[in-house]
Amino acid sequence: MAALAMRSGYLLRLSVALGPRSRSYRAPPPPRRRPGPHSPDPENLLTPRWQLTPRYVAKQFGRHGAISGVPPASLWPTPEQLRELEAEEQEWYPSLATMQESLRLQQQALEARRQAREQRIAECMAKMPQMIENWRKQKRERWEKIQADKERRARLQAEAQERLGYHVDPRSARFQELLQDLDKQQRKRLKEERQRQKKEARIAAMASAEAQDSAVSGEPSS
């Protein structure tokens, strides 16, 4: 225990003794830049890229003047750069006449879209009564078709019950099979009836056309 206390005291005295020496250390100042212009070496790989740009050269001339060694004629933009600057200026800072023309074209486009929208609305409103009438007609036809299917189904069920007897359950497989057969037979008869009517209509149309041709050919020529 006494040895540990003696060792701690030794370390404390050593730190006190080394303290002033560590505080007396002063790092050397960084090297100062020369007041004259700086000419970067393009052959040196350690030269930063931004020091080789025309912008840096222009800054050197603006800071140090003629002693920078930069010829003033090299600071003027080339004809291609001038054209690019003019195009950029026209894009970002257009003239008053250009802005007025652009505003006029925008207003003209807005007016054209407004007129087209109003015309489309007027056309839709003009078609609205006929559209409502067509919708009501389709709704009525669908309702009539549903009612006709219900009546046809009821007649088929009545016919099936007459054939099998009223004691047969309509939900039985035998009753449903007979109902399907009767439905197929009826659909077949309706299809044949429609085909017959179409055939008769074609024959009547052909006869009417032949009669008209005969009447035209039988007229005396003047």
Swiss-Prot record:
Residues 21-47, 186-222 are annotated as: Disordered. The keyword Heme does not apply. Its main location: mitochondrion. A motif (Nuclear localization signal) lies at residues 184-200. Residues 203-215 have a biased composition (Low complexity). GO terms for cellular component: mitochondrial inner membrane; mitochondrial large ribosomal subunit; mitochondrion; nucleoplasm. Pfam families: CR6_interact (PF10147). Keywords: Cell cycle, Coiled coil, Mitochondrion, Nucleus, Ribonucleoprotein, Ribosomal protein. It is found in: Mitochondrion; Nucleus. Residues 98-207 form a coiled coil. Belongs to the mitochondrion-specific ribosomal protein mL64 family. Component of the mitochondrial ribosome large subunit (39S) which comprises a 16S rRNA and about 50 distinct proteins. Interacts with GADD45A, GADD45B and GADD45G. Interacts with NR4A1 via the NR4A1 AB domain. Interacts with ATAD3A and ATAD3B. This is Large ribosomal subunit protein mL64. The gene is Gadd45gip1.
